UniProtKB/Swiss-Prot annotation:
Belongs to the class I-like SAM-binding methyltransferase superfamily. rRNA adenine N(6)-methyltransferase family. RsmA subfamily. This is Ribosomal RNA small subunit methyltransferase A. Signal peptide: none annotated. GO terms for molecular function: 16S rRNA (adenine(1518)-N(6)/adenine(1519)-N(6))-dimethyltransferase activity; RNA binding. Specifically dimethylates two adjacent adenosines (A1518 and A1519) in the loop of a conserved hairpin near the 3'-end of 16S rRNA in the 30S particle. May play a critical role in biogenesis of 30S subunits. It comes from Nitrosospira multiformis (strain ATCC 25196 / NCIMB 11849 / C 71). Its EC number is 2.1.1.182. It is found in: Cytoplasm. Pfam families: RrnaAD. InterPro entries: KsgA/Erm (IPR001737), rRNA_Ade_diMease-like_C (IPR023165), rRNA_Ade_Mease_Trfase_CS (IPR020596), rRNA_Ade_methylase_Trfase_N (IPR020598), rRNA_adenine_dimethylase (IPR011530), SAM-dependent_MTases_sf (IPR029063). Keywords: Cytoplasm, Methyltransferase, RNA-binding, rRNA processing, S-adenosyl-L-methionine, Transferase. PANTHER family: DIMETHYLADENOSINE TRANSFERASE (PTHR11727), DIMETHYLADENOSINE TRANSFERASE-RELATED (PTHR11727:SF7). The gene is rsmA.
Amino acid sequence: MQHTPRRRFGQNFLVDSQTVTDIVHALHPRREDVMVEIGPGLGALTQPLLQSLEHLHVVEIDRDIVKRLRNEFSAKRLTVHEGDALEFDFSSLGESLRVVGNLPYNISTPLLFHLSRFTDHLRDMHFMLQKEVVARMVAKPSTSDYGRLSVMLQCRFEMEQLFIVPPECFHPPPKVQSAVVRMIPLKKPLIEASQEKLFAEIVSAAFSQRRKILRNTLRDYLTGEDYLKLGIDSNLRAENLSITQYVAITNYFNRVRSG
């Protein structure tokens, strides 16, 4: 059955066998692992994973691909969850979950935020993403790539770029390079669960106007005196602050607000 990649689903199918081998090697799957693949496409990664795993879950939104997968693989070995990964409850698959996928570039950032909600259920995640997105994920403070995505993910995950994948490894070839990233949940997230919403608001406000200084972007949260107490220069920009400093701001503001 031929399948034409659909632009609305951001489909760029992995077709390079060496890249598949490299991803499987990075995963080092064990037979008993609980693993879910997001966007399996034509099964380039699905097939070799099943050679190592007793069972695999996949989440796929394209009904033609769902039909293809159900015809090609035994339901005893492969469970196909038809639907949008952005709405999927990954906690329903159990604990110590391993997640892998060649993520559609058009939903990669919201999907990463969605998956961040399930850190208590995750063992690790390995994703193929646009190289520029991976650069932002792993970026350090005071660099051009460091931003909201860096802070929001690094407060929950230890992340590492593993290798680059060129466009010719896909069909159709994307216009950008890709990279594979490994994400391992921190044993203890840097921000308390009760503070996550406030933390996200503060980080978003700080990076809303990158060229403006903190005194302007965080004026709804901090006064000049607050900066002195925190030991933070209010003339810095959002990209100059470390994640621990954003955590400190959040905890401080919450204490002041609570009286």
